[in-house]
């Protein structure tokens, strides 16, 4: 697939889009392998390649789009044998195997040179050992979505602190409702709860150190305090019963029907909430409350990325392409509701007129000073994430098993990281 691809989907040639990338005289071949295989992302990727090609008429762009799931097993071979110039992947610890194998290029100098203005809030998610290895192009927020109408009925306000959270929850439980719906049949939802409780209890840096295997599950007092805070909610009946039997979608009717008043979830759930019949007047959003005062707040915002393989042949063109896709105007267009329908990572971008996207953008751009986490099953190595999330689900059902759970997680840590 070459540079003659049409850019009709995004209209990226609109006035004002000709960034500094257009000034570079690029030639040769630029090979891109992308996993943006679903219909809307595919159209975005094809249009990006087409527009970049129009900006650089002497550059031949070869775009290969592969199945998103298949790419997870193919990427190592692609990076090792005849690597392309640009690939899609994910941020944080999902980069680590390819950084450690010297398969992703260190692009710290490009970050330091100012190529990525407006991306400083997520620089940490592209950093390993103080070096940067990629750039982000889209993400979405997590947080607490709640039934505003029920909060109003009960006289509740959005909680800013853990004490306010617990007080609210007691009022909700006393009204005959659960504070939170959740479905842990697929374990990742429990991982989201641990992410937030641990980041709010101990801080983003502690959470990332745990993800890297640097802290003991059994000996670190901060980890135990996280579970103690979680147990406060469990013991007061904050969560719906039998959540281990439900997927996140199957748990949504508790929220829709008013049997539970809130859902800790990613912004992708809003469409399902609206489709269930709830109006925007009935739903609102707040940032997960502060637990330990003074800690900069970290947030879960799973981030998709572009990287330059270490064996790239056209590094100059790859650099310009990364600068292009992270520019504020391009990020605005590719993330709007007609395309990816997510959040631009560039703080200078604009967003669609949607209250939840607006709140998420404001939170991630201006109130996530602690750092951007990628989610439990992305930040922890795959095997550790699997064992860990099994333990987290078990804790939510059988909190008295905590010591046994932590012993298993510690055994896994010693085996997996060492």
Regions found by a protein language model. Give the residues of each.
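Extracytoplasmic "Venus flytrap"
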Residues: 29-47, 66-68, 375-380
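A structural signal for short loop-to-beta-strand junctions that line the ligand-binding cleft
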Residues: 84-85, 115-149, 178-182, 295-298, ...
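Hinge/lid segment of periplasmic solute-binding proteins
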Residues: 90-142, 166, 172, 193-195, ...
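Short, well-ordered beta-strand elements
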Residues: 26-37, 59-64, 86-87, 133, ...
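Glycine-centered hinge/linker elements that transmit conformational signals in sensory
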Residues: 171, 212-243, 288
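C-terminal lobe and pocket-closing loops
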Residues: 96-97, 266-280, 291-390, 416-418
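Extracytoplasmic "Venus flytrap"/periplasmic binding protein-like
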Residues: 47, 51-119, 127, 149-160, ...
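Extracytoplasmic/periplasmic solute-binding protein
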Residues: 129, 133-137, 142, 166-215, ...
């Amino acid at each position: 697939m070459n540079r003659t691809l049409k850019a009709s989907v995004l209209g990226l040639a609109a006035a004002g889009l000709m960034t500094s990338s257009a000034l570079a005289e690029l030639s040769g071949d630029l090979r891109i392998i992308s996993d943006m295989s679903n219909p809307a992302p595919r159209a975005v990727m094809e249009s990006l390649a087409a527009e970049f090609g129009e900006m650089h008429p002497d550059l031949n762009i070869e775009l290969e789009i592969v199945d998103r799931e298949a790419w997870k097993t193919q990427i190592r071979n692609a990076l090792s044998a005849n690597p392309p110039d640009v690939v899609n992947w994910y941020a944080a610890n999902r980069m680590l195997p390819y950084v450690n194998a010297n398969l992703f290029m260190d692009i710290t100098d490009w970050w330091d040179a100012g190529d990525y203005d407006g991306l400083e809030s997520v620089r940490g998610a592209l950093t390993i050992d103080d070096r940067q290895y990629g750039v982000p192009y889209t993400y979405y927020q997590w947080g607490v979505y709640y039934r505003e109408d029920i909060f109003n009925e009960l006289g509740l306000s959005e909680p800013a602190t853990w004490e306010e959270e617990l007080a609210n929850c007691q009022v909700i439980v006393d009204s005959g409702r659960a504070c939170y719906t959740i479905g842990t049949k697929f374990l990742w939802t429990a991982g989201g709860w641990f992410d937030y409780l641990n980041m709010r209890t101990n801080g983003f840096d502690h959470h990332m150190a745990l993800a890297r295997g640097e802290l003991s599950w059994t000996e670190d007092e901060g980890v135990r305090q996280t579970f103690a805070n979680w147990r406060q909610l469990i013991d007061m009946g904050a969560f719906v019963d039998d959540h281990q039997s439900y997927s996140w979608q199957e748990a949504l009717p508790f929220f829709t029907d008013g049997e539970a008043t809130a859902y800790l979830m990613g912004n992708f759930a809003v469409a399902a909430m609206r489709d269930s019949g709830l109006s925007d007047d009935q739903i609102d959003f707040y940032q997960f409350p502060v637990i330990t005062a003074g800690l900069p707040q970290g947030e879960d915002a799973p981030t998709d990325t572009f990287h330059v393989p270490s064996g790239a042949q056209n590094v100059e063109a790859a650099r310009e392409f990364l600068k292009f896709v992270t520019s504020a105007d391009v990020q605005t267009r590719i993330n709007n509701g007609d395309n990816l329908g997510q959040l631009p990572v560039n703080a200078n971008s604009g967003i669609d007129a949607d209250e939840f996207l607006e709140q998420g953008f404001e939170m991630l751009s201006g109130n996530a000073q602690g750092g951007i986490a990628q989610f439990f099953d992305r930040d922890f190595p795959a095997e550790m994430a699997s064992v860990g999330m099994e333990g987290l689900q078990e804790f939510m059902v059988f909190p008295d098993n905590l010591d046994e759970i932590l012993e298993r997680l510690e055994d896994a840590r010693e085996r997996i990281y060492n």
